[in-house]
Curated annotation (Swiss-Prot):
UniProt family annotation: Belongs to the HrcA family.
GO MF: DNA binding
Name used for this protein in its record: Heat-inducible transcription repressor HrcA
Keywords in alphabetical order: Repressor, Stress response, Transcription, Transcription regulation
Organism: Corynebacterium jeikeium (strain K411)
Function, in words: Negative regulator of class I heat shock genes (grpE-dnaK-dnaJ and groELS operons). Prevents heat-shock induction of these operons.
TM annotation in the entry: none
InterPro entries: GAF-like_dom_sf (IPR029016), HrcA (IPR002571), HrcA_C (IPR021153), WH-like_DNA-bd_sf (IPR036388), WH_DNA-bd_sf (IPR036390), WHTH_transcript_rep_HrcA_IDD (IPR023120)
GO BP term, pick one: negative regulation of DNA-templated transcription
NCBIfam families listed in its UniProt record: hrcA
PANTHER family: HEAT-INDUCIBLE TRANSCRIPTION REPRESSOR HRCA
Keyword presence, Transcription regulation: yes
Length: 341
């Protein structure tokens, strides 16, 4: 088979997939001749369609109907996308402005899925940060009374933990900054596991004679609370938007159930390891509940690491080029905001 024939058949396949995505109706040879500049007769296109069907790229639901893409056909279409639809400059500005108004990480992520759902008209999902990948950014100690302080632990993933701590004895205004400096020098810039190890070592110092006497008792209380806080691993959580968009398609009801249970989608997003977009189509999805859907996903993060995954879940006939563009743009701006914080 000549390269020209192969190129033409690829054009025919791309035309079938594009038309089916746009209309959700089977595509016939006459429709292709009328809509696309393929430069060949309807008979040649019919022959190409027969070959594509024999190779498993398209299928025919009824003898008298046109063709629709198979998962194999969608995969070849997606792999052949060289350029995704670019978002306009006003669209990009609007995305950044909307996300920058988020008051904290969770608000930024909620806004991101709202945007993705609106841009793609599908379900958008985002995974809250994997806390194991975070590093301690700062620990603040705020005096609430002679015996009580507010302990605030902040990580670069946006996690903020607050604890009211009863010290069991008074702490002076001079000793509080000294204690704050001790715990920050042990934790800042370190992973949660390393910070926990260092704080445990600091607790041992408080039990011995290597720490100033006036700080030992209060340091032991504070380090104990910090170790408990650092060891906590809240369950992964998904934020969703646009679930009603899937309700329009009855065959996607198992997907809706999977989204509600979260476990299946979390497993998929947990597999995201970088900021490259991944597309899994229909039967390519490992979990049965997602085999009627396509998932376009990517990672988001700061300058140090990927913190979690986000993406779009929709039918196999979703607009792949537009969806890839939207997911890429929103993840980019979320990552940019996190890196600036």
């Amino acid at each position: 088979m000549s390269s020209g024939t192969e190129h033409r058949r690829n054009q025919v396949l791309r035309a079938i997939v594009s038309d089916f995505i746009a209309s959700h109706e089977p595509v016939g040879s006459k429709m292709l001749v009328d809509r696309h500049q393929l430069g060949v007769s309807s008979a040649t296109i019919r022959n190409d369609m027969a070959v594509l069907e024999a190779e498993g790229y398209i299928t025919q639901q009824h003898a008298s109907s046109g063709r629709i893409p198979t998962v194999k056909g969608y995969r070849r279409f997606v792999d052949g996308i060289n350029e995704v639809k670019p978002l306009s400059t006003p669209e990009r500005r609007a995305i950044l402005d909307f996300l920058e108004h988020g008051v904290d990480l969770e608000d930024v992520l909620r806004r991101s899925v709202q945007l993705l759902s609106q841009l793609t008209r599908q379900v958008a999902v985002v995974q809250m940060p994997d806390l194991r990948r975070g590093r301690v950014k700062h620990c603040e100690l705020v005096k609430l009374g002679s015996h009580r302080i507010l302990l605030v632990l902040i990580t670069d993933t946006g996690r903020v933990d607050q604890r009211n701590v009863d010290l069991g004895q008074p702490i002076s205004d001079d000793d509080l900054p000294r204690l704050r400096d001790l715990v920050n020098s042990a934790m800042v810039g370190r992973t949660l596991d390393d910070a926990c190890t260092n704080i445990a070592a600091l607790a041992n110092e408080a039990k011995g004679n290597s720490m100033p006497e006036e700080l030992r008792d209060v340091a032991l209380v504070v380090t104990t609370v910090l170790v408990e806080t650092l060891l906590e691993r809240p369950n992964d959580r998904l934020i969703l938007a646009g679930t009603p968009n899937l309700m329009r398609t009855s065959e996607l009801s198992p997907v809706v159930e999977a989204l509600e249970e979260q476990v299946v989608v979390l497993k998929l997003l947990n597999s995201v390891r970088d900021l490259q977009v991944q597309v899994s189509i229909g039967e390519e999805n490992e979990d049965e509940e997602l085999r009627g859907a396509s998932v376009v996903s990517t990672g988001y993060g700061n300058a140090n690491a990927v913190l979690g995954g986000m993406g779009v879940v929709g039918p196999t006939h979703l607009d792949y080029s537009g969806t890839i563009s939207s997911v890429t743009a929103v993840a980019h701006y979320v990552s940019r905001i996190l890196s600036e914080e």
